[in-house]
């Protein structure tokens, strides 16, 4: 299998997960993050069985379970009487082969960042604000504000809701 040099714009949940999966497959990966340090804001996040299979593939299942919860069901009640009006089960682990879990977004981000850095301590390059990219005959060049460009075979845009990569593509 050919080894690719893969550039990832963004060190959020998607970028870190993609990086770890690609490194596990034997590729050279570099993540470029605009922030001066890694940190994730937000509240709770749900990890469905499908996503949990990916976390298991990365070997971080135990860390997720230690920091998260596995709710049994969603229960909807009337506010004034407490009467249950709807209930649906979330614990269908036997059916899907993995649990449904919930944890704090920052905890998931920390776990994913640790996993990526275990594979390559220098995988995340901070203070790299992406300004765009250029497709070349042999790959792609990722451009930054106040930094030299870098070249790779493949570019993954995981740079968030205000994605510079996506905006240039569409």
Please report, for each region that a protein language model flagged, where it lies by residue:
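Conserved N-terminal helical subregion
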Residues: 2-6, 48, 52-170
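Conserved hydrophobic helix-helix packing surfaces used for dimerization/oligomerization
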Residues: 6-8, 29
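Active-site-adjacent beta-strand anchor residues
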Residues: 9, 41, 102
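N-terminal Rossmann-fold NAD(P) dinucleotide-binding loop
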Residues: 15-16
């Amino acid at each position: 299998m050919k080894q690719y040099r893969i550039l990832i714009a963004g060190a959020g949940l998607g970028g870190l997960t993609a990086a770890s999966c690609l490194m596990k497959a034997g590729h050279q990966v570099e993540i470029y993050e605009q922030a001066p340090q890694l940190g994730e804001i937000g509240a709770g996040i749900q990890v469905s069985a499908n996503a949990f299979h990916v976390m298991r593939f990365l070997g971080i299942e135990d860390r997720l379970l230690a920091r998260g919860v596995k709710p049994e069901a969603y229960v909807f009640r009337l506010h004034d009487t407490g009467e249950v009006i709807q209930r649906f089960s979330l614990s269908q682990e036997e059916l899907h082969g993995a649990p449904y879990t919930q944890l704090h977004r920052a905890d998931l981000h920390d776990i994913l960042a640790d996993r990526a850095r275990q594979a390559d301590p220098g995988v995340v390059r901070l203070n790299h604000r992406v300004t765009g990219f250029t497709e070349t005959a042999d790959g792609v060049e990722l451009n930054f504000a106040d930094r030299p460009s870098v070249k790779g075979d493949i570019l993954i845009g995981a740079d968030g809701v205000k994605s510079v990569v996506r905006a240039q593509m569409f």
